[in-house]
Amino acid sequence: MRYSQLLVQAAELAKTEPERAEELLRKAESIALNAYPDDMILCARCWEDYFHNHDNAMRCLLEAECRSSNTSGFLAVAAAHLRHFHNSQLAERCYNKALEKATDSEDHLRIQNFLSEFAPAKAEIETTNNKGWSHLKND
């Protein structure tokens, strides 16, 4: 069975049969480990969205980062950190790795596209996080 099918089944069973669903997700993860970083990102999203397990989600993202070997892989992980997990520090680390791996004009175009899409999100996350801390200090 393909890992994507396992992810779908895990999502469907998350509320009714959580133990079985976790088993399926772990199988999907073991397959995704040998594939592309995007596959581990999907596993991370499943852990977060259906099981509310942030630790396993972050572990999957770290695996995706470790298995990335090119600009597009690191940018995909950076995008996941920003879009789904709202973590600008980890996104920046992946972005810097993407910069280091950039070798040609296509890589530089990917980086420019990433910046165009995610610079506003990064600023918003940092502003929200700062407001959150300010709010807590004022209470």
Residue ranges: model-predicted function:
Residues 106-139:
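Terminal, low-structured helical/coil segments at or just beyond the last alpha-helical repeat
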Residues 7-8, 38-43, 73-77, 93, ...:
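Alpha-solenoid helical repeat scaffolds
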Residues 1, 34-35, 69, 106-109:
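Residue signature of alpha-solenoid helical repeat architecture, marking inter-repeat boundaries
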Residues 15, 26-76, 80-84:
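Alpha-helical adaptor scaffolds
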Residues 11, 15-18, 36, 48-51, ...:
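Short coil/turn linking the two alpha-helices of tandem helical-hairpin repeats
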Residues 1-33, 129-139:
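N-terminal alpha-helical interaction modules that lie
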